[in-house]
Amino acid sequence: MAENQYYGTGRRKSSAARVFIKPGSGNIVINKRSLDEYFGRPTSRMVVKQPLELVELTEKLDLYVTVKGGGISGQAGAIRHGITRALMEYDESLRPTLRAAGYVTRDARCVERKKVGLRKARRRPQFSKR
């Protein structure tokens, strides 16, 4: 690994992202595609950029990301978590700011399992009195 390269792993739902940060001009590459190309929805793009905008390093760092599993929303969340961890490795003094915004905490919510005798996790079959 390069000396001036920082790494962070992010997870959300069933997605996992590996994020590499290098000093640069603000390029974001996700699975060999640009941010705008990879995420069609503006909300997903916004989620990915949140930690960088918070610490005002959007134009100073290049990001190289590989992400697997899950859907669009889960992948965006995983990338955000990975960026946050990589930023803390880059500069530990950013931790309190990122913590206050709630980016350091891994969002543990995931899909609830389907139970036997039910149609979904909690949806019961229709009840008939007669």
From Swiss-Prot:
GO terms for biological process: translation. Transmembrane segments: none annotated. The keyword Ribosomal protein applies. Pfam families: Ribosomal_S9. GO terms for cellular component: cytosolic small ribosomal subunit. It comes from the Bacteria. Keywords: Ribonucleoprotein, Ribosomal protein. GO terms for molecular function: RNA binding; structural constituent of ribosome. Belongs to the universal ribosomal protein uS9 family. This is Small ribosomal subunit protein uS9. The lineage of its organism: Bacteria, Pseudomonadati, Pseudomonadota, Gammaproteobacteria, Vibrionales. The gene is rpsI.
